[in-house]
């Protein structure tokens, strides 16, 4: 990041109003690739005088690429020129990819510098490495959700038009040429098909340049969640430290001020309704959970407020059906690969005082997490480990590997899933997943050696079972001291790890 500051000072483009000239700086593309552009001048149909810029970042080359992008429409109609037709047919995606990679670096610079300056203002930066773990979210839910009544399962609304993404950046970056270039790249090259679409998950990105689309989607989510910055300064113990630095509040507060002028009395009443000390909000990627100890009417007001705010003031299309309100005692919500619920457990205790005895009915609530076996089987079937019925099948694409590599790959997948699903309250579904992977491994090895599964399992013996079933027990035996509480009973309890920073690919397929 210090390199970014040096480059900005060197080029004299320290303010975010002058980002467009950075697109013509060679070091931007070096930073984007960590090496040269690896551009072959012959594929660009460039004249011989610039052929010396092969495998280098060239100001002249970038200028010509941007010029050709803007001239795309005229080149499409020039069907008589074979070289121009070649540009339209073959090099079109290459030009977009090259310029967009540089653009992704440029738009990140102001936000990166703002984050660095905000961290330097704090004398002590809190050490929150453990809070980065995905499992830390569940430990928070386990502590808080058992005392709440209602939960809203929210899918972040998707923009129906790419112009929305440009308008969001316009609130933060006042460099008009850069925004025009981004708008042109969107509409002329992607036509909205590779961006965030209703047919895909709300966090789907284009594969051409994931860095740029990750930045655009994060900007979009920050805009959606800006409602919480206005209504609540803090909503949980796991609040994000970088959220405030990445959010430009000027544009949002301008809208809220306009609302307050026109509907000041009603707006104050609305704010009073949402002052709920027991409201908790958690989000990961495109899905969020909002829970409250309030009434069902309060949750309906929140739902109405979200829909109206997104549609009327942020111009986001948000169907009310994407927000589901349910009572904890009768509902299980799917979040981060776990099926979570807060069931009510009723029990009766007989109490006796002197000669009188009576029954006391007690009600307890406990946050429970389980592995949803049906979606997991669907994910395993997509990865070709089993069929849709859950019957294990062989993995033909791995049959050419050595036996040790095959066992190691299956074992690694099994260990990763066991590690991620260690917080499950009931392990039966996890055991079934292990069984599918173990038998799929055996079928793959039997297919390779042209043998039967039964004969192969007999030849491998019990060591083959330990590779898939005993790894988690070995880890726990090293981590936890010997106590009177048996290890078998301990393994049945939910265990949350603080070293999981990403979801397993099989879980992420869901």
Swiss-Prot record:
The record's keywords, sorted A to Z, are: Chloroplast, mRNA processing, Plastid, RNA-binding, tRNA processing
The family database entries (InterPro entries) matched by this protein are listed as: Domain_X, Maturase_MatK, Maturase_MatK_N
- Protein localization: Plastid, Chloroplast
Entry annotated with the keyword Acetylation:
no
Q: Which GO terms describe its molecular function?
A: RNA binding
Q: Determine the domain of life of the protein's source.
A: Eukaryota
For this entry, list what GO says about its biological process: mRNA processing; RNA splicing; tRNA processing
**The UniProt record lists the keyword Plastid:** yes
- What does the entry list under GO cellular component? chloroplast
Q: Which Pfam families does the entry mention?
A: Intron_maturas2 (PF01348), MatK_N (PF01824)
Q: Which residues cross the membrane?
A: none
Family, per the entry?
Belongs to the intron maturase 2 family. MatK subfamily.
Role, per record:
Usually encoded in the trnK tRNA gene intron. Probably assists in splicing its own and other chloroplast group II introns.
Under what name is this protein listed?
A: Maturase K
């Amino acid at each position: 990041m210090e390199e970014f500051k040096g480059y900005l000072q060197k080029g004299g483009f320290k303010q975010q109003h002058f980002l467009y000239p950075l697109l013509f700086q060679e070091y931007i593309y070096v930073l984007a690739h960590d090496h040269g552009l690896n551009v072959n001048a012959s594929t660009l149909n460039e004249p011989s005088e610039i052929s010396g810029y092969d495998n280098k970042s060239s100001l002249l080359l970038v200028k010509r690429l941007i010029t050709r992008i803007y001239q795309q429409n005229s080149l499409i109609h020039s069907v008589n020129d074979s070289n121009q037709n070649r540009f339209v047919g073959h090099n079109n995606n290459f030009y977009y990819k090259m310029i967009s990679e540089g653009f992704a670096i440029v738009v990140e610079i102001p936000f990166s510098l703002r984050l660095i300056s905000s961290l330097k203002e704090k004398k002590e930066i809190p050490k929150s490495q453990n809070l980065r773990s995905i499992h830390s979210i569940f430990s928070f839910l386990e502590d808080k959700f058992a005392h709440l009544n209602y939960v809203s399962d929210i899918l972040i609304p998707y923009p129906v038009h790419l112009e929305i993404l440009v308008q969001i950046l316009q609130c933060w970056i006042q460099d008009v040429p850069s925004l025009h270039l981004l708008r042109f790249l969107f509409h002329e090259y992607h036509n909205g098909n590779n961006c965030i679409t209703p047919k895909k998950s709300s966090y789907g990105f284009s594969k051409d340049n994931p860095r740029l689309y990750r930045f655009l989607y994060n900007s979009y989510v920050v805009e959606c969640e800006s409602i919480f910055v206005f209504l609540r300064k803090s909503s949980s113990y796991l609040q994000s430290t970088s959220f405030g630095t990445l959010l430009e509040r000027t544009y949002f507060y301008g809208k809220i001020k306009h609302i307050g002028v026109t509907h000041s009395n009603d707006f104050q009443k609305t704010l009073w309704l949402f002052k709920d000390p027991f409201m908790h909000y958690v989000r990961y990627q495109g899905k969020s959970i909002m829970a409250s100890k309030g009434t069902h009417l309060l949750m309906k007001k929140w739902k109405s407020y979200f829909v109206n705010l997104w549609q009327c003031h942020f111009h986001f299309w948000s169907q009310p059906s994407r927000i589901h309100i349910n009572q904890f005692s009768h509902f299980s919500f799917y979040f981060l690969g776990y099926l979570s619920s807060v069931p009510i457990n009723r029990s009766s205790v007989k109490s006796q005082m002197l000669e009188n005895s009576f029954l006391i009915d007690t009600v307890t609530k406990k946050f429970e997490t389980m592995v949803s076996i049906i979606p997991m089987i669907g994910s395993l079937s997509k990865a070709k480990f089993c069929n849709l019925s859950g019957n294990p099948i062989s993995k033909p694409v791995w049959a050419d590997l050595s036996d040790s590599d095959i066992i190691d790959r299956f074992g690694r997948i099994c260990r990763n899933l066991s590690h991620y699903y260690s917080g499950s309250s009931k392990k039966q579904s996890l055991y079934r997943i292990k069984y599918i992977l173990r038998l799929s491994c055996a079928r793959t090895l039997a297919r390779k050696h042209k043998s039967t599964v039964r004969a192969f399992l007999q030849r491998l013996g019990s060591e083959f079972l330990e590779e898939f079933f005993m790894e988690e027990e070995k880890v726990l035996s090293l981590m936890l001291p010997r106590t009177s509480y048996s290890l078998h009973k301990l393994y049945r309890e939910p265990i949350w790890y603080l070293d999981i920073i990403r979801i397993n690919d099989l879980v992420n397929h869901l």
